[in-house]
Amino acid sequence: MSWQQRVDDALTARRATDTLRRRYVVSQGAGRWLVANGRQYLNFSSNDYLGLSQHPQIIRAWQQAAIRFGVGSGGSGHISGYSVAHQALEEELAQWLGYPRALLFISGFAANQAVITALMKKNDRIVADRLSHASLLEAANLSPAQLRRFIHNDTQHLSRLLQSPCVGQQLVVTEGVYSMDGDSAPLAEIQHIARRHHAWLLVDDAHGIGVTGDEGRGTCWQRGVKPELLVVTFGKGFGVSGAAVLCSESVADYLLQFARHLVYSTSMPPAQAQALSASLAVIRSDEGRERREKLAALVQRFRAGVNASRFTLLNAHSAIQPLIVGDNSRALRLAEALRQQGCWATAIRPPTVPVGTARLRLTLTQAHEACDIDRLLEVLHGAGE
C-alpha cells in the first residue's frame, strides 16, 4: 500500500462512518455568543466556563506584560525562557493548592505526556480509568510501562487490577471531571485504594480547576484528596491556555531533569503567565465565587428542564452536559438542527467517545443568562426525534 493509499483509505473510512472531524472558522468562539459566517449563535460549545477569556482585568494584564516582556519567552525555561512572571505564577499556584511546587507547561496534553513518560519505566504498571483523556492514554501507551484500564469509576475493578502482582511501581490515573461525560470520579475512594496498594495517584483536573471547590481550588480540594500528581489546565476555568503540574519538591526537580516536553519546548510567553496570575486573582476573589454560583444555577436550570423532556442526561452536575444520541449521523443532524435555530452545539463521535455513544457535548458558561438556557431547552425539545 502506498503512502497516498494509506491516507485516502483512512479518510474514506471516517467518511463512511460519519466520524470525519471538521473545523469551523469563527470570528468569535468564546463567550456567550459564537460568530461564524456573519451570523451570531448562542454558544454552547466553549470551555470558557467562567467567562474569563473576555475579562478586562486579565486582558489588560496580558497587554501590559507584552509591552514589558515582548510576545514570546525566547526559549526553553532551561535556557532563557523562565521569567519572573513564570516564577511568580508557579509560586501562586503552589500556595493556592497546597503543594510544595508547581511546574508550568504549554498545554495539558504536554503536561500529561511529560509526567507519565518521565516517571514510568519497564515493569511498572499504569492503571487508568477507561474514559481518561487521550493525552493520558496515549502517554501510557508510549511509555514502557504496562497499561491496564479499569471500568469507568468502578473502584472494585481498580482494586482488583492493583492487587495483581507488579514487579515495579504502580500509577493510578483518573480525572476530576470527565471531559466528555461531565461526571466526577470517586476520588476519595480511589485515593484510599491507591495508597493501600502503595500506588501513586495522578488526577487531571482540567475541567474542575477554577470551577469547583473553595476559591475554585478544584475537584480534589472539594473531595479532600491530595494526589501525588495533580495536573491543572488553564484553557477552561482560567479562560487562557497552558497547564501546570503540582507535586513534591523532589518530583519537581526530577521532572525538570527528565520531562522532555518541559526541557525541549519553548516556555509560554511571560505575558501569558502574567495573564494567568490575573485570572487566578479573579478566581479566588468574591467575583470568582459569584461567577461559580451563577454557573451552578444555570446548570441546575438546564438539568431541570431537560429532565422533563424526552432527553436523558448522564449523572453530570458540571458545566459539561452531554446529550447521548447514540448514532453518529443523528448526532450530526441534531447539531445542525440546533444551529439552524441559532444555538451552536458540537456533535462528538467516535473515536473521541465509545462507539454507540455519539452525543451533543453541551457546555454552559457563566456568560450565559437564564433566557439563553430556556432558549436552548426550547430548541432541543423542538428538535428531538
Curated annotation (Swiss-Prot):
Pathway: Cofactor biosynthesis; biotin biosynthesis. Its EC number is 2.3.1.47. Keywords: Biotin biosynthesis, Pyridoxal phosphate, Transferase. Substrate binds at R21, H133, T352. The keyword Protein biosynthesis does not apply. It is an enzyme of class 2 (transferase). It catalyses: 6-carboxyhexanoyl-[ACP] + L-alanine + H(+) = (8S)-8-amino-7-oxononanoate + holo-[ACP] + CO2. InterPro entries: Aminotrans_II_pyridoxalP_BS, Aminotransferase_I/II_large, AON_synthase_class-II, AONS_Archaea/Proteobacteria, AONS_Proteobacteria, PyrdxlP-dep_Trfase, PyrdxlP-dep_Trfase_major, PyrdxlP-dep_Trfase_small. Pyridoxal 5'-phosphate binds at G108, F109, S179, H207, T233. The modification N6-(pyridoxal phosphate)lysine is found at K236. Pfam families: Aminotran_1_2. It comes from the Bacteria. The keyword Translocase does not apply. Its cofactor is pyridoxal 5'-phosphate. One of its GO terms (molecular function) is pyridoxal phosphate binding. GO terms for biological process: biotin biosynthetic process. Belongs to the class-II pyridoxal-phosphate-dependent aminotransferase family. BioF subfamily. HAMAP family: BioF_aminotrans_2 (MF_01693). Homodimer. Catalyzes the decarboxylative condensation of pimeloyl-[acyl-carrier protein] and L-alanine to produce 8-amino-7-oxononanoate (AON), [acyl-carrier protein], and carbon dioxide. This is 8-amino-7-oxononanoate synthase. It comes from Salmonella paratyphi A (strain AKU_12601).
